[in-house]
Structures are given as C-alpha cells and as structure tokens.
Regions:
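Alpha-helical transmembrane segments and their immediate juxtamembrane cytosolic regions
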Residues: 1-193
Length: 193
C-alpha cells in the first residue's frame, strides 16, 4: 500500500512539477501522504524484530545512497544537498536510516539524557535536507519509544506531521501544508497491523 501511494505521489510530482492546485494533483498527493507514516511505523517495528541491527542498518544506509541518485534524477535537483535549497534534497530513506539510529541510541543505557538530546539535535541537522526532513527521524523515535501504546504513537506521529505542515504553511505552500495532514489516513491502516 505504501509503495503504491508513494509511486502515485512521486509520479504526480514528476508529471505536474511544482505545487499544482488542481483536484487530481491534490488528491494524488493526499493519497501519497500515507506512505511516510507507514514507513516510520515499520522502521520502528523492524528495529524491534530484527535479529541483526547492524545488517538492518547497513541495508537501509545502502538503499539511502542508491535512492539518492534516483531521487535527484527524478526531481531534477543537484546531487549535492543544500546547493539550491535546504528542503527535499534527498529521499526519505536517509531520514529513515537516521531514525533507526535514534532508536538504537534511545535504548542505550550508557548515554546520559543530555547526551541523547545532543545526538537527537545532531541527527536532526544531518537529516534536515531529506524528504520529510528531520520530522521523519523524530517521528520514528517517538513511534519506537511508545511501542505498545498505539494511541500515543499515533498522537506523537500527528504532532510531528503538524510541525511539518506548519513549516510548509510558513515557508513553502499553504495548500500543501493542509495536504500534509492527510498522513492521518495511515492511522486506520496501521491500526489493522
């Protein structure tokens, strides 16, 4: 479901570049909003169930590097992030990888609270240039931290989506800020898991 929604969303961006406000484009982008929350949720679930964190992380990092080429080619953006803008310079897979790293950090008993806070800030800076920016990394952290409490997981997920929508509203596009909130459509799908 997430791959189909993502494909519809990305094809819409490629066929109709920019922030088009026609109903077909908006509808396809709204459908696409379910993708990221599903990915966030399953990164956290994968972390819980994996037998080898190292292999899981390496596969995700490799996929992030490979998908960067496809992402920059598809959207006609420079290969090197931050050369034109700070937003959406690489795929969401980069943020997924760093979200996974935050889950591992969160489980560490060797790190003090202030050290974890510094790491979260650093990871947010590292993942800022990706699709869904650092919102994806902190959403994964909160989804993983509240595993076992679906309502709390989804509440925090939507808090972070709302933060992303606010950034869109003030810095990118007001209509597409509202589109981000359609991530809530993923909640019934995730509840059925």
């Amino acid at each position: 479901i997430a791959i189909i929604a993502m494909t519809a969303d990305h094809l819409t961006w490629v066929i109709w570049p920019g922030y088009q406000t026609g109903w077909p484009q908006l509808a396809l982008h709204c459908v696409g909003r379910i993708t990221a929350p599903i990915m966030w949720f399953f990164i956290a679930e994968g972390y819980h169930y994996t037998h080898s964190f190292k292999k899981y992380a390496l596969r995700l990092l490799l996929f992030a590097v490979i998908s960067h080429f496809a992402y920059t080619f598809a959207f006609g953006i420079p290969f090197i992030p931050f050369t034109t803008t700070a937003f959406n310079q690489t795929s969401v897979i980069w943020s997924l990888f760093w979200g996974l790293m935050l889950l591992k950090m969160n489980d560490s008993h060797k790190l003090k609270g202030w050290q974890k806070a510094v790491i979260v800030v650093l990871v947010c800076l590292i993942s800022f240039c990706s699709d869904w920016s650092c919102i994806a990394t902190v959403a994964i952290l909160y989804i993983g931290a509240y595993r076992g409490s679906f309502k709390t997981q989804m509440t925090w997920m939507m808090v972070w989506v709302a933060v992303y929508a606010a950034v869109y509203f003030f810095f990118i596009d007001k209509i597409y800020a509202a589109v981000q909130l359609f991530a809530a459509l993923s909640i019934p799908l995730l509840k059925s898991y």
